[in-house]
Amino acid sequence: MLSKLPKSSKLVVIGGGIIGCSTAYHLAHMGLEVVLLERKKLTSGTTFHAAGLVGQLRTNANITQLLGYSVDLYNKLEKETGLGTGWKMNGGLRLACNNERWTEVQRQTTTAHSFGLEMDLLSPKEAQDLWPIMDISDVVGAAFLPTDGQANPSDITQALAKGARSKGATVI
């Protein structure tokens, strides 16, 4: 492995999980010289254990915007690299089973709209129409964010690494 190490690099990223590979990907796409170092195999750390759920709405507009960017990236990464990411835009459902939670879900929907996200308030029956096996006997209301989804973190990491390599990054 030491023979593969370049003598120098402008930037070195330590860790070949989704964060390290994303960092290398974006730096390489900016035209910067980058080396990514992983001590074992890509995704062999915490990325391997991640659930891969991608919910975009947060209380902070900047984080919500970053998560929206991630959704856009997952949509294009497969085309760019030829590697699957497991990305499925199947939406996210938020349930309210009491009036206090319903008020919170309504506020979240208002926040989503102010951040430019499509999020719809639903009756219990409308929520059940989306997921027919759901028992709605105690559901007061729901909200659905159609652009949320799920992905395979290991697959995304491999695609990010390939995308970084395609722009000149060295992944060791």
Task: Locate the predicted segments by residue.
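Dinucleotide-binding Rossmann-like beta1-alpha1 core, especially the glycine-rich loop
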Residues: 52-130
